[in-house]
């Protein structure tokens, strides 16, 4: 990865034509790391993502007694068999929501207290709904932070299991966290969704897929509940991690913006990653999408043809919102993105950040409690603030492919999920 300056000017260019190697999925890497750390014996994970978020998960799991040997993107994890140790110091989840929440649930299996903390923004991201669900399954935990946010002290001693209700309207990570630890409960776990509501369901389906790959007995129990057999420990496996669909959103969006063509190899034909749903949105806006031989190719509209504006519910693919918001700058009318309230509790308040930075580039943008409306205007270059949010940096860099004078402030924050992003962008 090239050392990045504090402010990086993006060079406009014509239609791109590129084959882009997208790094491994962060979501899958962190789920597989945790399952492998809980399993007995050695698991081999191929295609892992090395990033700030996965380093945070790895560091926490090492402190809990697992070991990880890295050989490029192939990691060998020696698991604990569910017998976690009590770390000597609080665990640092950094700015990783998946790490803080998944590890908080797993820490119930330790024999003594475990404190999970993180970066300042992590202390503003909710965890109370997860803690309440864990308590409903017999765990003991104390929230040490303000307003239901970390740090959290999990007292350990195991997870009894049984039945609990969880409020998953703000984050699906709460559900995934409970599920990932559930095979080590003393009896089977049933998790009921409060009011049947679940944001970003595809991420829970992804969790179930990873758990089954490690031998868990888990799944949906009707439309509003999930179950996991227990005690039913994971088994050690060799597991292949596919490319990150959330990361692939940026080269796909680049093809749309420049009227070019991008091919991303490595996706399974039956991939269930949430952000691949962006492909259908881009098709409706006038792009052509083709799948063949394990690759996905997106071609933007021909020169002289504008992208079509769209009104779209993105609840199931929230991480793709930022890329689409920048694509909307080049549409033929106003685009509205709906049902994305949980963007306000991500690495930053993404709805507020998008509204501000889209306006900075000349768009007429307005954000509501769970929606964003983008009306293209006379576009102009400007420095773009990134709010220490990797997706803000990666998305707004795409605007610079068409708009002269776009400068990304703190581009290094992209290392959270794609450390080599700006090197890749320069090569497209």
Regions from the PLM with identified roles:
Residues 1-428:
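Short, structured segments at the rim of ligand-binding sites
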């Amino acid at each position: 990865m090239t050392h990045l300056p504090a402010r990086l000017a993006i060079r406009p260019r014509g239609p791109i034509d590129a084959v882009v190697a997208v790094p491994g999925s962060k979501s899958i890497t962190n789920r597989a790391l945790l399952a492998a750390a809980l399993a007995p014996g050695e698991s081999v994970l191929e295609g892992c993502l090395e990033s700030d978020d996965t380093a945070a998960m790895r560091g926490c799991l090492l402190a809990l007694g697992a070991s990880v040997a890295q050989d490029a993107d192939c990691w060998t994890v020696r698991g604990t068999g569910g017998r976690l140790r009590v770390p000597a110091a609080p665990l640092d989840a950094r700015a990783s929501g998946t790490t803080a929440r998944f590890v908080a649930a797993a820490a119930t299996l330790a024999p003594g207290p475990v404190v999970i903390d993180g970066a300042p923004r992590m202390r503003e991201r909710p965890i109370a709904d997860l803690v309440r669900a864990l308590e409903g399954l017999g765990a003991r935990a104390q929230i040490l932070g303000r307003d239901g946010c970390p740090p959290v002290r999990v007292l350990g001693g195991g997870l009894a299991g049984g039945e609990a209700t969880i409020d998953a309207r703000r984050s699906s990570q709460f559900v995934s966290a409970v599920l990932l630890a559930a095979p080590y409960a003393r009896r089977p776990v049933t998790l009921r969704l409060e009011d049947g509501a679940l944001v970003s369901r595809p991420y829970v389906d992804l969790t179930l897929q990873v758990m089954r790959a490690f031998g868990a007995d888990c799944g949906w129990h009707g439309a509003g509940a999930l179950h996991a057999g227990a005690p039913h420990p994971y088994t050690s496996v060799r597991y292949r991690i596919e490319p990150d669909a959330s990361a692939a959103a940026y080269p796909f969006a680049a093809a749309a913006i420049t009227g070019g063509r991008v091919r991303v190899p490595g996706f399974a034909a039956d991939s269930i990653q949430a952000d691949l749903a962006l492909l259908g949105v881009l098709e409706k806006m006038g792009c052509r999408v083709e799948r063949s031989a394990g690759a996905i190719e997106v071609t933007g509209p021909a020169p002289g043809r504008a992208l079509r504006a769209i009104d779209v519910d993105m609840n199931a693919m929230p991480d793709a919102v930022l890329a689409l918001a920048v694509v909307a700058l080049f549409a033929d009318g106003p685009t509205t993105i709906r049902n994305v309230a949980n963007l306000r509790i991500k690495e930053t308040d993404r709805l507020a950040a998008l509204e501000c930075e889209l306006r900075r580039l000349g768009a007429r943008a307005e954000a509501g409690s769970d929606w964003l409306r983008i009306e293209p205007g006379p576009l102009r270059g400007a420095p773009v603030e990134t709010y220490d949010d990797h997706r803000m940096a990666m998305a707004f860099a795409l605007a610079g492919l068409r708009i002269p004078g776009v400068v990304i402030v703190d581009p290094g924050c992209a290392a959270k999920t794609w450390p080599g992003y700006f090197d890749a962008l320069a090569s497209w």
